[in-house]
Swiss-Prot record:
Alphabetic keyword roster: Leucine-rich repeat, Repeat
InterPro entries given in the database record: F-box-like_dom_sf, F-box_dom, FBD, FBL60-like, LRR_dom_sf
SMART domains given in the database record: FBD
Domain F-box, residue spans: 1-47
Residue windows of the LRR repeats: 97-122, 141-168, 198-224, 229-255, 296-327, 328-353
SUPFAM superfamilies referenced in this protein's UniProt entry, alphabetically: F-box domain (SSF81383), RNI-like (SSF52047)
UniProt-recorded name of the protein: F-box/LRR-repeat protein At1g52650
Pfam families in alphabetical order: F-box
């Protein structure tokens, strides 16, 4: 007998758990002793692509879809009431089937702790999931993709659920739905289609919240007092009536905007006082107020531009230690002066690109426009470490670095990461030599250590003697 065949049944079942369910079924027929092991495999990974072969156009054939569903029925029947830990289902069909709800009910009744379901219904928007299925004391992780959820808070019972991921889901729930998940710690809302445009996420236990690319979003209310990590990459909501995130430690805000919204953001206020587009941008200030206790903050180019409409309502970020700002030449730094002044304890500033859209409203944060009070917004900033990424070696960038050296009073270290993939002047020997000379010149007139890095490794260092 070979070594694999002599392994204990528990070990063999664990090995089978790393295979797709079809692979496990095919493997089990190789040895007489293995034939019943599929009944005790604790992890079922069922993917219809190994049956339907969509790359060959067979997924639309009715008989193949029927064969797949019959296979799932047989596997679940074979397992009977044996305990199950994980059930993953990926299924494409062109007709709604009650079987999906039956399969989910089966594994929930057997104590499944991790459930991952993707069902694509051809010719219709979403396959509806029955709330009657979702009553379980054991479910810890639930991932739902491309399905319809029309539930009320009282319809479900998931007291142990810690992770909920909703991807491309049609969501028809009331404002109490998330509150009905008492153990929830991680919530992901990705490309969700909301029935009600005014969305409320209310939960006392959530620690990590991700909201990306949602549809039909009107107002957004966040009542998440235990939230620690927040990632928001979405269209600007109409309003943020509630943003309760007192324990927030890290946040990434990446607003999705149209060029029309940017145009209106840059227009003089006097012309758009009553304009709904501008009011929507101004209301972003309420979201910023909600994240004011954050220690680590990342802002996209769009977000920084939108914040130019929130300067008067910009909160104090008293706890902020590290600020990362992404830049590109199509978006401006108008909000930079106010933002830096409102971060009194900032220690690390990371600029992912120095090039940005130049406007007179950049004021004294950069060297783009000559100002009588140049650098005034920087002199009160306590930044000790400045990290610059995507450095291309342009004269404009060099002037900006010089500006920072002259006006950040507490600056002790600058890390400059050279651009490796995009355009750069640093591959030209004459330019590279000029930059080296300028860096040495800057260093002599400051108390700052300057490092030029390539691929994260030190290329050149100028250290104060």
């Amino acid at each position: 007998m070979d070594h694999v065949s002599s392994l204990p049944e528990g070990v063999l079942c664990n090995i089978f758990s790393f295979l797709t369910t079809k692979e496990a079924a095919l493997t089990s027929i190789l040895c007489k002793r293995w034939r019943n092991l599929l009944a005790f495999v604790p992890n079922l990974v069922i993917d219809d692509s190994v049956f339907l072969h969509p790359e060959e156009g067979k997924e639309e054939r009715y008989e193949i879809q029927q064969s797949f569903m019959e296979f799932v029925d047989r596997v679940l029947a074979l397992q009977g009431n044996s305990p199950i830990k994980k059930f993953s289902l990926k299924f494409r069909t062109d007709f709604a089937s009650h079987r999906v709800n039956a399969w989910i009910s089966n594994v929930l009744a057997r104590g499944v702790s991790e459930l991952d379901v993707l069902v694509i219904l051809y010719g219709a928007e979403f396959l509806p999931l029955s709330p009657k299925c979702f009553k379980s004391r054991n479910l810890v992780t639930l991932k739902i993709n491309s399905l319809g959820i029309d539930w009320l808070a009282g319809d479900i019972f998931l007291p142990m659920l810690k992770t909920l991921v909703l991807h491309s889901v049609k969501l028809c729930v009331d404002k109490f739905f998330f509150r009905a998940l008492p153990a929830l710690e991680e919530l992901v809302l990705f490309a969700v289609s909301w029935r009600d445009r005014d969305v409320t996420v209310s939960n006392a236990s959530i620690k990590t919240l991700t909201i990306k690319f949602n549809y039909y979003l009107g107002t957004l209310s966040l009542d998440t007092p235990s939230l620690v990590s927040f990632c928001f990459s979405d269209h600007v909501a109409k309003d943020y009536p509630l943003a309760k995130m007192e324990k927030l430690s890290e946040a990434r805000i990446s607003l999705l905007v149209t060029e029309y919204q940017i145009e209106r953001a840059r227009a003089p206020n006097i012309y758009w006082v009553e304009d709904d587009v501008v009011l929507r941008l101004v209301n972003v200030g309420k979201l910023m107020k909600g994240i004011r206790n954050v220690q680590y903050l990342n802002l996209s180019p769009n977000t920084l531009e939108v914040l130019s409409k929130c300067c008067e309502s910009m909160p104090l970020f008293n706890n902020l230690k590290s600020l990362t700002i992404e830049s590109n030449e199509r978006r401006g730094w108008q909000a930079m002066p106010v933002l830096l002044r409102n971060c009194p304890h900032l220690e690390t500033l990371v600029l992912e690109g120095l090039l940005h859209h130049v406007t007179e409203k950049c004021r004294n944060a950069c060297d783009c426009v000559s100002q009588e009070e140049k650098g005034r917004s920087l002199t009160s900033c306590q930044v000790k470490v400045l990290e610059i990424k995507g450095f291309q070696g342009t004269t404009k960038e060099m002037h900006t670095i010089k500006h920072f050296l002259e006006h950040f009073p507490c600056l002790r270290e600058i890390k400059i990461h050279m651009e490796e993939n995009g355009p750069t002047q640093l591959r030209v020997p004459e330019v590279s030599q000029y930059i080296a000379e300028m860096m040495e010149h800057y260093e002599k007139s400051s108390s700052c250590n300057v490092q030029l890095l390539v691929g994260g490794y030190l290329c050149k260092k100028w250290t104060t003697q």
